[in-house]
Amino acid sequence: MTGPRVFKRSEMVLKPAVTPTGTTAIARVVDASISREMGAGIEYLEDATIDWTITYDEVLFILEGPLTIEFDGAAHECNTGDIVWLPNGTHLKYIAKQRAAYFYAVHPVDWAAKQGLAEP
């Protein structure tokens, strides 16, 4: 675990993520090497649909929208500045018909490793 840090956008490395449709890239800035509890980063989506059941608690802050998130039988259109709470076990679908981006914070940081998965 490390002390306080500032992550400069110019130093973030975007990595393509494996998805069934569209384009997505993730810059993970807080991972298990930095925190034992939380993870955080930025994800960019463009013309992408991701169907997923999360196995962690997550908070999203929409940086660029619109981004539609379907959960609990409804479609929620999220725009710049909106905040979304997604508890562990939520089945959802992210739909970005154009470029969208969000900051995410997750707990626990090692959700994928606990399930024997590589992070997407």
Q: Where in the sequence are the language-model features?
A:
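Short, conserved beta-strand element in jelly-roll/cupin
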Residues: 44-46, 53-70
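Charged, glycine-enriched surface loops/patches
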Residues: 77, 112, 117-119
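Short acidic-glycine-tyrosine-enriched beta hairpin
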Residues: 72-88
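Ligand-binding loop in jelly-roll beta-barrel domains
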Residues: 88-114
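A short, N-terminal "cap"/entry segment at the start of jelly-roll beta-barrel domains
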Residues: 1-42, 119-120
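Conserved short histidine dyad/triad with adjacent acidic residue
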Residues: 29, 36-54, 88
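A generic structural motif
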Residues: 57, 64-66, 73, 89-91, ...
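General beta-strand recognition
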Residues: 51, 68, 77, 93, ...
